[in-house]
């Protein structure tokens, strides 16, 4: 498994910060090759937002106790306090990029770009440009 992660102020704690319109608090990437499974289960969610981009392979998400297989070219958005349950499997060769963010204008920014409340999965296509944006965020937080 390949992993590259970065955290604002070197903390892995999720935070809620309303001091700016949008603050990236952590971001990273995972690429499973041989690890059989990488599960995440946050029954109470987090205090911040999370956006995940499936760059290759697929991921298994659970919304309202129903499994949804999300393939490459899709993004998944979790809002604060939403339960988060998902798994990546090595056999799927999943490559995922993720970012956690907070801020005082996040809801309006998401609405402006078409992210509607109650929907989690959005198609955006497979583009190297998206991966490069995530890599830039990771590098910035690692400085």
Residue map of PLM features:
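Generic protein-terminus/edge-of-domain signal
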Residues: 1-69, 90, 113, 117-120
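Amphipathic, well-ordered alpha-helical segments in soluble domains
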Residues: 23, 50-53, 102-105, 129-133
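Amphipathic alpha-helical segments enriched in hydrophobic/aromatic residues interleaved with Lys/Arg
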Residues: 109-143
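Short acidic-glycine-tyrosine-enriched beta hairpin
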Residues: 65-79
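Ligand-binding loop in jelly-roll beta-barrel domains
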Residues: 67, 81-105
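Structural motif
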Residues: 49, 75, 94-96
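DNA-contacting interfaces and partner/effector-binding or oligomerization modules
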Residues: 71, 107-108
């Amino acid at each position: 498994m390949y992993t590259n992660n970065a955290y604002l102020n070197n903390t892995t704690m999720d935070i809620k910060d309303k001091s700016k319109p949008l603050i990236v608090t952590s971001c990273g990437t995972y690429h499973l090759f041989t690890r059989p499974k990488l599960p995440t289960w946050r029954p109470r969610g987090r205090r911040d937002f999370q956006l995940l981009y499936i760059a290759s392979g697929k991921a298994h998400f659970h919304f309202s106790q129903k499994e949804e297989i999300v393939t490459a070219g899709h993004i998944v958005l979790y809002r604060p306090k939403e339960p988060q349950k998902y798994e990546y499997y090595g056999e799927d060769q999943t490559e995922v990029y993720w970012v956690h963010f907070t801020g005082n204008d996040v809801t309006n920014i998401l609405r402006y770009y078409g992210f509607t409340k109650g929907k989690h999965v959005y198609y955006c296509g497979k583009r190297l440009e998206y991966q490069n944006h995530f890599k830039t965020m990771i590098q910035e937080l690692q400085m």
